[in-house]
């Protein structure tokens, strides 16, 4: 664990880490931390850090990163991190060398979180709860209880509200109709729950990030009801 460091440059290597470590950075400020090539960590977690840059040049075997309670931090990713969990963060920059190393970002209370991909600039985008609230004020999104999932869908970064069916199965409104037809994993066994979920949904959010230019993004917001009428 790297804890309560301030203004330091640190390199984590196989010489100063145990085999298969769980690498945790906690309460670090104004630091630059490099996870060197050759390091194979089980998991990477960053908690309560500020103005700190973490460069992942090694590997995370679970391909999972957790970031929570961080402000103005940057994570540079040079190996597969397929799943990112972001909670209660402000101004977080997730910078991937390759878009293929990313699959999804799960977020709650995420403000000004950017996702960039050096080899696919058109896939860049942001997750910002403040923007979502402003664009859809009637939804009453909560930083504590509402969770979103961000993925690449049809060539763009798509952020959707996660909903749960009556059996607590997590999904999105876009995927519920597909599940009701049995076209996704465990779909046939979940048909009754999907129909119930469709009648009970109170929130509908679909946010598509499309490139406006190399220097900015245009956020196109559609309510699911409006999309269905288009």
Which residue ranges define each predicted feature?
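Feature marks extracellular polysaccharide-active and adherence modules
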Residues: 26, 34-38, 47, 55-57, ...
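Short, polar loop motifs at secondary-structure junctions
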Residues: 60
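The right-handed parallel beta-helix/beta-solenoid scaffold, focusing on the short coil/turn
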Residues: 8-10, 21-23, 29-31, 42-44, ...
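Eukaryotic beta-rich interaction modules
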Residues: 3-18, 26-28, 35-38
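Intrinsically disordered, low-complexity terminal regions
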Residues: 1-14, 83-230
């Amino acid at each position: 664990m790297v804890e309560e460091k301030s203004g330091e440059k640190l390199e984590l290597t196989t010489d100063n880490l145990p085999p298969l470590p769980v690498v945790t950075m906690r309460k670090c400020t104004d630091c630059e931390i490099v996870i060197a090539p050759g390091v194979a960590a089980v998991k990477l977690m960053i908690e309560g850090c500020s103005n700190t840059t973490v460069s992942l040049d090694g590997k995370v075997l679970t391909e999972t990163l957790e970031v929570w309670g961080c402000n103005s931090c940057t994570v540079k990713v040079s190996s597969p991190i397929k799943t990112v969990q972001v909670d209660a963060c402000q101004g977080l920059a997730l910078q991937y060398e390759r878009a293929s190393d990313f699959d999804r970002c799960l977020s709650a209370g995420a403000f000004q979180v950017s996702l960039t991909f050096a080899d696919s600039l058109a896939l860049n985008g942001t997750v910002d709860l403040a923007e979502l609230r402003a664009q859809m004020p009637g939804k009453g999104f909560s930083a504590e209880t509402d969770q979103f999932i961000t993925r690449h869908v049809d060539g763009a970064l798509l952020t959707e509200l996660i909903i749960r069916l009556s059996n607590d199965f997590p999904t999105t409104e876009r995927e519920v109709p597909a599940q009701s037809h049995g076209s996704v994993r465990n779909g046939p066994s979940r048909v009754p729950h999907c129909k119930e979920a469709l009648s009970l949904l109170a929130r509908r959010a679909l946010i598509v990030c499309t490139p406006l230019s190399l220097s900015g993004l245009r956020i196109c917001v559609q309510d699911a009801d409006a999309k269905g009428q288009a």
